[in-house]
Amino acid sequence: MIAEQVGAVGVQDFLAPAARLRGAGTAGLAELSDLEHADRLARMREGSLGSVHSWELVTAVDGPGTRMTVFLAGCPLRCLYCHNPDTLEMRRGEPVEADELLARIRRYRRIFQTTKGGITLSGGEVLMQPAFAGRVLRGAKEMGIHTALDTSGFLGAAATDQMLADTDLVLLDVKSGIPETYRKVTGRALQPTIDFGDRLNERGIEIWVRFVLV
């Protein structure tokens, strides 16, 4: 059901014309804004193309060491205190090739190795684009780079076993542990996040729980 939601809502939203990017931007990444809509849809579903809002190098809270944090566009939640409201709609990202993004990641491999850093896929909600995220994670692991997902966990069912096998760390953003409060804050149910957390625990994946004090 969740995977269907990603396909029916997220991908269709991606077909709209790309708007001007905000944030750090996608400097250095190829822009593919002239792709036909049908081609975008097919390539996004297979994971060779994604909608990227921006990326930046950070050393603060997105995982250990120096990180290249990639913000994907699109999110199913509507949090009252959203930190990145300009990433909510997939149409506000730019179409970016997975291979192009991996080439950019490769350029920072020595920095990641020196600082014990890596890449963090964030958003928006990274699991709105599971095929693209999975391809980037696989490519990063093949380069020996530490990987992290920054996610609400609401779309955790969309994460394949292979994707999780390629993930070293999950930054799990739990908006509230009270179902009623969670729905009030996000407009969605808490249980999918709990289920995803249980799945991560069963697989022994490192988790950093995030909780915002408002």
What is each model feature region?
Residues 6-7, 99, 177:
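Residue-level detector of intrinsically disordered/flexible regions characterized by low predicted structural confidence
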Residues 91, 95, 123-126:
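Short gly/ser-rich anion-binding loops that grip negatively charged ligand groups
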Residues 102, 106-214:
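Conserved AdoMet/S-adenosylmethionine-binding subsite of the radical SAM
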Residues 18-21, 31-33, 44-46, 100, ...:
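Short acidic/polar alpha-helix capping motifs at helix-coil junctions
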Residues 93-103:
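Short cysteine/histidine-rich metal-coordination sites, predominantly Zn2+-binding motifs
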Residues 1-72, 78-92, 107-115:
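N-terminal [4Fe-4S]-dependent radical SAM core
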